[in-house]
Structure formats: structure tokens, C-alpha cells
Amino acid sequence: MAVSPHKTYPIVITHGEKYTLFNDESIGKGAYSEVYRGRTESGRLVAVKTACKKLEVAAIGIEIEILKKLKGASNIVQYFGSNHTKMAPGSVTSETISFAMEYASSSLEAEMRRPKNHRGLSSNALIDLVVDCSMALSALREHNIAHRDIKHMNILLFPGTPTRGRRSTHLFKLCDMGCSKSLSENSSHEMRTLVGTPNLLHPFLAHEMVDPLMAQNRHNWKTKSAYTSEQCDLWALGCTLYFCATGKFPFEHERNNKSLYHKAVVALTQNPDAIAMVLVQKGRDPGRRTDIFEFQPVTELPAKFTRYPKWLVSTMTCLLRSFFHEPSIEYYAKVADAMRNSKRRTFSSVDQMSIVEHTDMSNVPHLGFSIPSISKCLGYPEGTDILLLSNTSTHYLDSKQKSVDGLPDDLYLVVPQTSHVDMRKILARNIEFHEFDDMTDRKLSEIRIKKCYEGLSMLTEIDEYLALFDRVSTILSTQFSLLVQELSQFERVQTASRFAVYVDMASVPLMLFDEANPETKMISDQCIQQAKRAREELERHAKVSMDIEACAKQLSKDAEDLRLEDMDLPGICEEIESYVFYDKQAILSTQKYSQELVELCLKRRNNIMEQIFNSPDRINKSKLNKAMNLAASLSQLRSNYRKLQDMISECVDLLEKPFQEMKDTVNRYLQAQGCSRNTMQKSMHLLRPEFHESQIRIKKTTKSCRKLIDQLNIELDQLGFVRLGDILIKAESEQTLTRSEEIQETQVVSFFCQAESSPNKEQFPKPEQDSILESSIDEGSTSFESTPPSSPPDVGSNNYFQAVFQYFAKPTSSPSSSAK
């Protein structure tokens, strides 16, 4: 701190950065001080608060010391420098004091006087106000300071950006520490000084206001009951937040009837659920000829006009209840932190005609149980499940679910899963405002504010409807396009269908080469029957998929036509706000044109409502009905698509078990007989559709071969001969016969194996397509145990039969071979 070297008067004491005060640029005036615009030596624009009376100087001196302690604290107006001047004794003004602080763009008081906030702040601005005040009170508590005069006039607005959890363009900061008090760390933090604004006082302080002796010595009056900083500051903040949310204070107050406020707050303390008390007329006293009034409790934050989301109404109700009944800055900080940092999702509801910015408050202690489910927060009756559609996903929400966990996207379209949906009631608009010359200034200003509020609220409502139908159109169009894209890719249907054909074909070689085994034949027949059944189901579902795809394509085009056509009224919001006057002459002189502006807003609203609710040609449906039908159609198509997917899975399950049995049988047979895998793959390849004629010939030849072999064996047995290679010999004994059979089998197998490996294969002519067959087998044959190939394996009954089958299955190419 620097002291002027001159000991003569005036004595000037400065601190911090020097500044210049502009006496002709007053910003505001309070009961004890005035605020002017100023600028520091570095060029910063500041607000300079100054006072010259003894009590004012003392109050500002306390405020300067407290602001120094709070330097850098969150959401507290920042201090830059001060100037204290003491005049010579006998001067008209003995001393003056001033200090420079941050220059605010506006105040909460001025914001609440704007016509658009006549019924309360927007939800985003209210949430930021709650969070910023929480941070300010936490900073005061950290430095052991009680503010003791929190109200909307002592909260300043600074430019902000909706980032990092912020929702509005306002940054709120607490100011005016003239009534504040630094508390000792070792003290009980209890206070008895009567200080504060009359209609925001804690009940302990309100009780003192009705004492007739208090008015004579208010500045030195001490309360009978001590109060804490939490009690007085949170009570005043609760009254302020209620006012900012509804446009009215929670308790009736009359300047000349202090007992009215006192009775209201006492009545509230006796009702633990109340957050406000409303004075209502209950009758009339005939003896005294006066009306009888009583206080009625308000147990939930009114939101008829502001249309706050239900999660916010519940949160604010619980918060105000704690302020008035169980004040706790720690609990307030937890709730405020959740309001800023919890997960947020945006839900657009066509039938409710609303866009809800939902914040997940279900995990906040002592608050989550009072938060309604998401379904109820969106305006649906108890027990209504909902379908949520985004640009990328679809989710079903139970009617009791409160958390947004599992919802990855930010924006969703809501489709209630119920046959009957009640539409949200749209408030009727009344623009009949009469401003007459015989009205008082106050009455005229109230009417003008209501008139401008109606016009601005209609514009806000229109903007919400435009945004709603834009989002609905985008989401529905995208969802239908995604469905078309999914249905155009029949991968599951095609894969399962190919599998069914494969099972059918894979059963053939098992029947060809092992017809003598009844068990194997039964498995093959079962596979074939199941495969045919599954293939028929899949073909039917493929057709259903094509129908759904065609329907989705058409509905996607219809969804693009949901957007509303709007009248362009540039700058009308600012123009309406400029016609808010408090002077009688100004109000009467602008009556006609201000009414024209409001009527223009109504015309724009009627144009939008006409598109939403009425058919354009009495043939086509209205935008609202079309949007609801499209949403329901999308839900139904999605349901049909899910059933289709489930049926495909059932078809695959139907095929899997018998096919696995057949596959195991084939593998066991191959292992037992020692047949080569290459032979199996060749027969599988031969069973492809392009070799259909060859397949028929093989089947016929196989049956003929079996008959010929059986007949030949019978005749040889009757004649008593045994075939040894190309030689028939007489069977001399049973032992000789057995030996002959073994030699015969060995020679036949050896003979045919040499024929297969020999380059000269004229003895066994091949079918016309054998050259193509062999090349394709070598290039792309697959294993029976890997991904299903297009044809099944070849398995012979035994080596002798296999050799004979290969011999007789091939057509003869020359007479010599036939004779042989």
C-alpha cells in the first residue's frame, strides 16, 4: 500500500492498479453507493464503485478487504484497485472511497426485466445460474466469509460460452460484499446482526422485522436466535432461484406489512415439503366485511410457462427444499456438480411436440430416488416403454429406466411403445392487450411486458417446432436408409441358404456309397428333409426382405418431406424487446405498432400450426400424423426385420445338428475304410450343379452295377468258380476259396490303382468333362471339415466295390474295352 508523501490534506491512499472514473457515465445506483464506468492505466474497462458517507465508506472498506481475500476465487467479481481520500476537517465531505472491479455486461436484475424472462429464465440459463452460485458460495465458505445479502440485484452477468459443461452464453458472478462478514476459524460461525433484504430474510431475521422496537435501532439490532452463514445465504439464494425460475418470489411481501412475509415463512417451516407459500382467498368475513386469506403450500416448482424438463423441475424442487429446511453447502455443491458434468442426451418427441435436454441425475445421493424415469420425464404415462432412434442406432428403454447409460448418441427420436398416445396440450394464445390512458404507469408497464412476452414466447415456440421437425426428418430418413442398406445385403440369408443347399448335396455321396447302412441312410434323409425345409423358409424370408426394403425406400423419401416451411421475420425479437417502456406516454404512443408486431408473431405461429395439424389438401395427412405414422412404421419394420433375423438363426440351428451327425459319420467311415480325402473331394466336386447329368448317370449306373455284381456272384457260387484277376478257377476247398478271394481283391485294387496313376488310361475312358473337372479340383478343392464346399464327399462301401464302381461308372469308348 502506497501513502502519499504529503502530510497535508487531502490524504490519498491507493492500492492496486490505478484507474480513472468517468463521472458522466453512471452504471447504477444503490442505497449506499453509486457505480460508474472507468478505465485502468493499462486500458482495461472497469466498474468503479464509490461512496462518501460515513456508513457507506465503512461498508465499502469492508468490501475491499473481503474482495482482496477472494482474489482469483471462482464466480466472485474480481477486484483491481482502490482509492481512499480523506479531506481536511470541516470539509463538506470528510472522505471518499472507491474501488475498481470487473465490468459486467449486465446484471441478473436487468436480465429478469427482459420480457422474454417475464415467466422465468430459460432452462439452460437457470442451470448455469445454479452451478455458478454454487461455486461462488463454495469459495466464500473456503475463506470463512458470509455474504448475508444474496439477491438477483447482486449477481452480475459476463459473456460466456456454452463449453465444458456450460449451457448458456452467460457467466454469473456474485458481487456487493458490503454486508459480508469474515468469520473467525475458531468461532462458532453464528451471527446475530440484522442484515439483508426484507423479502429474502431467513425466518430468524424475519421474526425480528415485526418487532415494533426494531425500526428505531435497526443498525444495532441483534437477533434473539443466532443464525449461520449457510442458513442466511442459502435461504436468500433459494428465494432468488425461485424468482429466476418463475418470475415471482416464493413468499408474499408488502412494503407496509412486514408481518405478511413473516407469516408466510413461518408457515413454510411447518411444512417440510413446501418450497413456497401462496396466499389464496378462502372466503369472506361478513362481520368485518373483509376477505379471509390463508397460505397454501407449493410442493413442486411451477413450470407451466417455462416448460422446464421434469428432471430439472424435480432437481430444483429438491434443491429448494434443502435450502429452506436442511441447508447444506456440501449437498448443494454435489447437486450443482452433477447438473454440470452428468451425461446429457437430447430427446425429440413428435407426439409431445417437444425437444427435451435431459441430464442424468439418477446417481446423485438423496436425489436420484425423486427423479422420474426417462419415460415420465418425456411426458408419457407410468409404464410406457419407449423406442429411441438415432442416426446410427436403435434402443429400447424400459418404462422404469432412469439412467442414460448405454445410449451412445447425443440425439434421439422417441417412439412410445403403446397403441394410444395422448398429445401434449398446446397453450392457447391471447394477444388482446388493452392499454388505456386512464391506467397508471405501473399497470401500463405490466401490460406492455406481458404483450412483448407473448410475442417473444410465440417466436421461441415456433423455433422449437422447426427444430423438432428438422431433427425428426433427419433421423427418420437416416434410419430408413440404414434399414435399406442392411436389407440390400442378404449375407445371412445367402449364407444360410447356401448352407442348406450344401447339406442337401452333402447327403448324396453318403447314400451313394453306403446304401447298405440303414443308420447312415436315415441321417442322410433327415439332412435332406431339414435342408429342404430350411431352404423354403429362407426363400420366403428373402422375399419378405425385399418387400421391407421397397417399403423402407419409399418411407425414406416421405421422411424428407417433414420439414416445415417458415415465414422469415429477421430482427423481430430485438424489435419487440425495444418496445418495452415504463413511461406512460411512450407506452401509449407505441400501442398500435407494438400490437402489430405481436400479431405478426401470431400469424407466423398459425402458419406453422396449420402445417403441423392440418392436411394441406384434405387428402394427404398432416405433418404431425405423417411423422407419427412414419415413426410407427419404422418401429414395425425394425420389429419385422428382427423376426426375420431370428428365423434365419432358427433355420441354421435346424440344419446344424443333423449335419454334424452326418459329418461325424462320414469322418468315421473315411477313417475306418482308409479312403483318401482326394477321392472324397473329387466326388464332392462332381456333385456340383454343372455336372447334374453326370450325377444322374452315376446313380443309374451304380444301381445297375450292384445288380450285375450280385447276379455274377450268385452264378459263380452256383458253378463253384472263383475269379482270380481275369482267370476263373474251380474252388477246390473252403481254404483255397478264401485265399483266392484275397488274391482276387488284391489284384483288382492294384490293377485299378495302376490305372489311375498310369498316363495311359485308355482302358477307363473318362466323361467328356473330366479334363475340366481335374483342373478345377486341383485349383480350388476344399476340405470337408473346413468351410462348407459346394458339394459333398465320395465314400465307397469297400475297396472292391469302389473299384468296380469306378470301372462301370465310366462309359465305354471302344468295342474292345466293352468286350473285355
From Swiss-Prot:
GO cellular component: cytoplasm
Coiled-coil region(s): none
Sequence positions that bind ATP: I27, G28, K29, G30, A31, Y32, S33, E34, V35, K49
Chain residue ranges for the region called Disordered: 758-798
Assigned keywords, A-Z: ATP-binding, Autophagy, Cytoplasm, Kinase, Nucleotide-binding, Serine/threonine-protein kinase, Transferase
Observed effect of gene inactivation: RNAi-mediated knockdown results in defective clearance of paternal mitochondria and impaired accumulation of the autophagosome marker lgg-1 in 1-cell stage embryos.
Domain Protein kinase: 21-299
Main location: cytoplasm
Keyword Membrane applies: no
Subunit structure comment from the entry: Interacts with allo-1 (via N-terminus); the interaction is direct.
Family membership noted in the UniProt record: Belongs to the protein kinase superfamily. Ser/Thr protein kinase family.
The protein's name: Inhibitor of nuclear factor kappa-B kinase epsilon subunit homolog 1
